[in-house]
């Protein structure tokens, strides 16, 4: 059978029509069923116009393989994680292309316990079976069932268990759901907090789910996607802004002045919040930017543990270390009590509680950390020969470096600054992150120097 190019390193993503269509979705469902032989799995889909049809084709493939399907309807990826571990079923699949272009869709697959099915943990096996298409005949008597269910209330219960609602003082929040799947969840949290008497006001923008994305595809990692949130925070005098991508597995925060807060500093903030409640705990972080997280965690009596970037690696490391929390600078936050999975809803709830408990604004909470360890933000360079360019940078700094680490790409540390350079798994791009010890001009100069070396 033909090659299925929609199978990527960690998930399934492809252009609609040729790379991903209902026939391919059916084959993926059959292949998942033949490979894992699950009894019951949960399905959900994001707001994209094709998600429902792809999900139903996937369901048909699973049913034809003898699998019972529970459909939770329109959902974010983390709602599939939650459904999988909460119901104790054998796996789950979310149909989503997150922040990919309009003409794309995709899938994220998990097995029991919401463990990821990634490249070397089953995704290649599912791909092989789907490509071969050599499935046994459908046995009508053994065909799986299909049922629609709602777990929204149980999911909201779980989210609010991470905070004490009575810690919340008067708070005004701008929330930008980007017309993605987050809107109905935000509505449900708002209703629940109101019922509990919490003095939290929600100002909701682009809250209605709309697969045509009239306000652009939501990806607040891109500066051009931040304006609406920033302006709303300033206009309404809000305490904080929250923005989501399409399947809300990432959450992006803005302070009371509408300033975007880099995910790196939120990792430190959440680590501190967890260590106050769980002294001595382990915190997982990625290798791109590390000094702030290490300093915060160590000062709070915790143990920082570095892991390779990427959700499959972070989740596995969290399990082996029994870490309470893990954070990546890309705004992915992982929680032990959430089956070690990432959530875009838990972080903003914790930060909102922290703002109330400390009696400080979000800007005040991160200002000192940003000054102590200024960072470049991730800079992408499209290069013809990434490996040769990285080798050039390493050779240039080899004598000066105090430490070299290859957990993920190349990290080199010096007395007052450090950098990480890594090749993308998915495109011919090299990603650079630079940070310093309280010296913005040094950080900027070294960033410029490395970029010149990469492009020389």
From Swiss-Prot:
Pfam families: PGM_PMM_I (PF02878), PGM_PMM_II (PF02879), PGM_PMM_III (PF02880), PGM_PMM_IV (PF00408). Keywords: Isomerase, Lipopolysaccharide biosynthesis, Magnesium, Metal-binding, Phosphoprotein. The keyword Cytoplasm does not apply. InterPro entries: A-D-PHexomutase_a/b/a-I (IPR005844), A-D-PHexomutase_a/b/a-I/II/III (IPR016055), A-D-PHexomutase_a/b/a-II (IPR005845), A-D-PHexomutase_a/b/a-III (IPR005846), A-D-PHexomutase_C (IPR005843), A-D-PHexomutase_C_sf (IPR036900), A-D-PHexomutase_CS (IPR016066), Alpha-D-phosphohexomutase_SF (IPR005841). GO terms for biological process: GDP-mannose biosynthetic process; O antigen biosynthetic process. CDD domains: PMM_PGM. It comes from the Bacteria. The keyword Metal-binding applies. Binds 1 Mg(2+) ion per subunit. Pathway: Nucleotide-sugar biosynthesis; GDP-alpha-D-mannose biosynthesis; alpha-D-mannose 1-phosphate from D-fructose 6-phosphate: step 2/2; Bacterial outer membrane biogenesis; LPS O-antigen biosynthesis. Coiled coil: none annotated. Involved in GDP-mannose biosynthesis which serves as the activated sugar nucleotide precursor for mannose residues in cell surface polysaccharides. This enzyme participates in synthesis of the LPS O antigen. This is Phosphomannomutase. It comes from Salmonella montevideo. The lineage of its organism: Bacteria, Pseudomonadati, Pseudomonadota, Gammaproteobacteria, Enterobacterales. The gene is manB.
